[in-house]
């Protein structure tokens, strides 16, 4: 949380020249967390945001999640309308929509858990974030779980939990998240590599590949 910054682009503005991949990788912090905040600033950020309304809203949302444990997908998803459809394409579309409702909801819940942990260092939030995410990861073979957006959300959540909750995760838990990141990241890379040149207007390239893989 910082003040609003503003700047002007005029004739004197330097032309942006993107650095090489090697330069970017060399400047990555070697410690975690490093996405939402850097480890060296962690305690200072906690202190500065003790009374921040936005910070408090994440903690409040995270606390509410404890009251609503995540069930398995078969118990969470609403299929009452899906079973009435006879067209397989309509059924699949309906399942994707219903599945996304659950995954999108949990993405917001897990984001709140990760941020609450970073704002407090209370291990309960990190543990609950991983617990919910590991349940969602187990859904990938379910007939009720479909669509690239669900997979890309899992990729994003896995990255956030791995980085944000790194200190709390066990070796086995880190391995699960890294394998999930590698599996889904590889899938999207293979699907979209060199695709940008063919269809620059394909938003999935930006939403699923560049944004998340750059995390």
Stretches with model-predicted labels:
Residues 7-31:
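Low-complexity, Pro/Ser/Thr- and charge-rich linker/hinge segments at domain boundaries
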Residues 49, 58, 67-70, 75, ...:
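Aromatic-lined, polymer-binding surfaces characteristic
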Residues 24-26, 43, 53, 59, ...:
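Extended, solvent-exposed functional surface patches
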Residues 63:
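Active-site nucleophile-His-acid catalytic modules used for acyl/amide transfer and hydrolysis
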Residues 1-4:
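Extracellular and select intracellular beta-sandwich modules with Ser/Thr-enriched
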Residues 28-49, 55:
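Mature N-terminal segment immediately following signal peptide/propeptide cleavage
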């Amino acid at each position: 949380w910082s003040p609003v910054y503003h700047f002007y682009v005029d004739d004197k503005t330097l032309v942006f020249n993107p650095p090489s991949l090697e330069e970017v990788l060399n400047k990555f912090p070697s410690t975690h967390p490093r996405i939402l905040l850097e480890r060296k600033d962690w305690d200072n950020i906690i202190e500065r945001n003790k009374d921040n309304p936005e910070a408090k809203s994440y903690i409040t949302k995270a606390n509410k999640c404890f009251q609503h444990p995540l069930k398995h997908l078969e118990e969470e998803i609403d299929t009452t309308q899906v079973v009435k459809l006879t067209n397989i394409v309509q059924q699949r579309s309906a399942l994707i929509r219903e599945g996304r409702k659950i995954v999108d909801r949990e993405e917001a819940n897990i984001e709140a858990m990760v941020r609450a942990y970073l704002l407090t260092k209370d291990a309960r939030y990190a543990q609950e974030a991983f617990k919910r995410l590991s349940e969602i990861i187990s859904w990938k073979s379910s007939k009720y779980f479909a669509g690239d957006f669900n997979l890309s959300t899992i990729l994003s959540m896995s990255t956030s939990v791995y980085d944000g909750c790194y200190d709390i995760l066990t070796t086995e838990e880190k391995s699960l998240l890294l394998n999930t990141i590698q599996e889904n990241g590889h899938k999207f890379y293979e699907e979209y590599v060199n695709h940008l040149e063919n269809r620059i207007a394909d938003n999935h390239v930006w939403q699923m590949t560049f944004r998340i893989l750059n995390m």
